[in-house]
Every structure is written in C-alpha cells, then in structure tokens.
Regions:
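Structured binding/interaction patches within domain cores
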Residues: 1-148
C-alpha cells in the first residue's frame, strides 16, 4: 500500500513494534544528520540502530541527546538563527530515537516530525522557503521497511 499522507503514515508507524519504530526513527533522523554536527546526536542515532541496545544505554544516550538539544536551542538566539534551529530539531529527533518506550507512544512519528522541522529550518536558512521533500522521503522509507 502506497503511503501518501500523514494520517496513513502515522497509523502505519503506530502498528510497528518499539524496535521497528526505533529503527525507522534512526533512519528518519539519519536523513537530516547533515544539519547537526554534534557527536552526541550522531552517537544516539547510531546506537538506536542496534537491536541489542539496553535500557541503560538508551537512558544515557537520551540524556546526551537532550543536552545537545538544549545547547543548540540556546544557540538559536533571539533572532532565530535558522541553521542552529535545524540542529536543535535534529537533536530532538535523536531524542525520540532513544526515548524510553514508556515515554512515547510513537517514537518514529516523533522523530519524523522533528526531522521535518529540521529540514524546514534548513531550507529557510538557505532562502529556499518552506517547501521540501522530507515527508515523501519518510513515506518511502516506511514503505521499504514494510516490504522487507
């Protein structure tokens, strides 16, 4: 089934196991990693891809990604530095990747939305406006996952 809207996208993500959601969340976040150079964020996304990740690792990585999110938010400034804002949303997407299953009902959806926000901020920063193809790329990634 081709997914071409957010209602179907969110519903399909919600049917996945937490492990599957974590894998997709990492994929969604990986697509925007070029917008954030923070090693804490990269480490969280990389670790989220591991099927054997422990709850202790998840908690530590969540705190690291949260610290990166707070640091990047502080860099945005009063005038909204859009590139820094993009990095902030990448860090938030990474937080979703390593969030406790009890803290989120749909990890992949949360990461997808933050990744879209990151891409939107980046396109504003470069003067391209708010149109981008991040949602379409996410729909395709989910379809690929479903077809395995």
């Amino acid at each position: 089934m081709a997914i071409d809207n957010d209602t179907d996208f969110k519903a399909a993500l919600g049917k996945l196991s937490v492990a599957q959601q974590r894998q997709l969340a990492a994929g969604f976040t990986n697509n925007v990693m070029g917008l954030c150079q923070d090693v804490r964020v990269a480490g969280a996304v990389s670790a989220a891809k591991r099927p054997d990740i422990t709850d202790i690792e998840l908690a530590a990585l969540y705190q690291a990604a949260k610290s990166a999110s707070i640091d990047s938010y502080a860099q945005c400034g009063q005038d909204t530095e859009w590139s820094a804002q993009a990095g902030h949303f990448v860090a938030k997407a990474a937080m979703a990747c390593v969030a406790s299953a009890a803290d989120s009902t749909n990890l992949a959806w949360d990461a997808a939305m933050d990744a879209r926000m990151a891409r939107t901020c980046a396109t504003i920063a470069t003067g391209e406006g708010t149109a981008n193809r991040e949602a379409d790329a996410q729909y395709q990634l989910l379809e690929q996952h479903q077809n395995r």
